[in-house]
A protein has these predicted regions:
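Short, contiguous, helix-prone interaction/anchoring segments in small proteins
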Residues: 52-74
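Alpha-helical transmembrane segments and adjacent TM-loop junctions that form the membrane-embedded core
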Residues: 22-57, 76, 80-86, 90-414
Length: 414
């Protein structure tokens, strides 16, 4: 491979390491120079360093693209090329926003923000998405003006070379930002990668319009500008929605839930886990709370010591703060266990996605109360009252008609 050739190098699993120019992987090489422990992607310090590095590279490349396209647009008289140049200038501004966002998100908690500043990264992603939308509207507006007053485009080999080089650079920026966004689980970098992809499509369409004008004389500059603007609006709207969802609050990934359950249930003293809630205050600022079912007859001091150990294990392995509530359950009363099994069967008969916990059996002189919680997903066709009434009726129909249900409905947060 020649020294000046640009090529994309893919690792296993489709992960992109970088683009080689003259035998150097830019991002990987720079990371090896400036980022200590660069493969520890869960470290807040490493995340911040990657964000600053990515932002700095983005600023430099986008300024170079702006200068090249501005020259090409001025020479050719193409409104689409000139608009695309200023799009790259706004991208440089977006890279500055991303850089500042990572810088702020890495700050330590303070009295005014005890949970840290991790969500500043989400806010920077939000601002990048808004910048994408603004650029889309401006491009459509300028393209409408071009439709009203079309002008011939002066094409040249220099213009085409600049546009092709711009496409290659933006493809590179898309891949390295997407790769980092996956490794760091970064909304800001994902927004930047989508922005780079939209720029790639935009510049490709501009190149096509330029070539069509050169060889056919058709003035499609304005139409292609509108098409590019609509695509930019779509991508900007998509990333805006995703970032807003993160700020409002999303359910955690199922893989994360499974990891938590695996760690907690890996301790023999824990018989079950429920009421699991994940509080996300930004990347690296995750807190979880859950209820762990333990034997009611167990030694409370030993159980408490084990619960402390589990909390530390979650902190060490998943980098999250954990608070665990101990729920005592009966494990050696045959009558209680048999009744619990019957009620669980009813709950699963109503809907297999439902689960039951905190089951207690309180006997009185004339009646027996069955007290328990039913955990249901957010998406269910039943209302809380329908679930409670159906279960109460089935339980009251049990032999003897002396059983009465006291039911609490819990909704999953994942």
């Amino acid at each position: 491979m020649d020294s000046g050739e640009i090529w994309i190098y893919s690792q296993k699993c489709g992960k992109i390491e970088g683009i080689q120019t003259g035998g150097i992987y830019m991002i990987t090489f720079l990371a090896s120079l400036f980022i200590k422990d660069r493969r520890n992607y869960n470290s807040p310090e490493v995340r911040q360093a990657y964000g600053i590095l990515s932002g700095a590279v983005g600023i430099g490349l986008n300024i170079l693209l702006f200068l090249g396209k501005w020259i090409a647009g001025t020479v050719s008289g193409s409104i689409a090329i000139t608009a695309d140049a200023f799009n790259n200038l706004s991208d440089a501004g977006s890279s500055i926003i991303t850089l500042i966002g990572f810088r702020l998100s890495g700050q330590e908690p303070d009295p005014e923000h005890p949970f840290g500043h991790g969500r500043m990264e989400y806010i920077s992603g939000l601002l990048v998405s808004v910048a994408i939308l603004v650029m889309g509207f401006e491009l459509i507006w300028s393209s409408l003006g071009k439709l009203r007053s079309p002008e011939p485009i002066e094409s040249s080999a220099l213009v085409c070379v600049i546009l092709i080089a711009s496409i290659l650079v933006k493809v590179y920026m898309f891949f390295y930002n997407r790769s980092l966004s996956k490794k760091l689980d970064s909304a800001a970098m994902k927004a930047t990668s989508v922005d780079s992809l939209s720029d790639t499509v935009a510049t490709t369409l501009v190149l096509i319009a330029t070539l069509i004008s050169k060889y056919t004389g058709l003035l499609l500059d304005g139409w292609f500008g509108i098409l590019v603007g609509c695509f930019i609006l779509y991508t900007g709207g998509s990333t805006l929605k995703e970032t807003i969802d993160l700020l409002i609050g999303q359910p955690p990934k199922q893989e994360f839930i499974d990891e938590i359950r695996e760690i907690v249930l890996g301790h023999s003293m824990v018989h079950g886990v429920h009421d699991l809630i994940v509080h996300d205050y930004g990347p690296g600022r995750v807190m979880i709370s859950l209820h762990a079912e333990v034997d009611v007859n167990g030694n409370i001091q030993d159980i408490h010591e084990q619960i402390d150990h589990i909390e530390h294990e979650l902190q060490e392995k998943l980098h999250c703060s954990a608070t665990i509530h101990m729920d005592p359950i009966v494990t050696d009363d045959e009558e209680v266990l048999a009744m619990k099994a019957k009620v669980e069967e009813m709950v699963h008969f109503l809907d297999e996605s439902f689960s039951m916990h905190d089951f207690r059996m309180v006997k009185g002189s004339t009646r027996t109360n069955l007290i328990f919680d039913v955990e249901v997903p957010r998406k269910t066709s039943y209302t809380d009252n329908e679930i409670v009434n159906w279960l109460k009726e089935r339980i009251h129909e049990l032999p003897g008609s002396k059983y009465f249900a006291v039911i609490q409905i819990d909704h999953e947060y994942y």
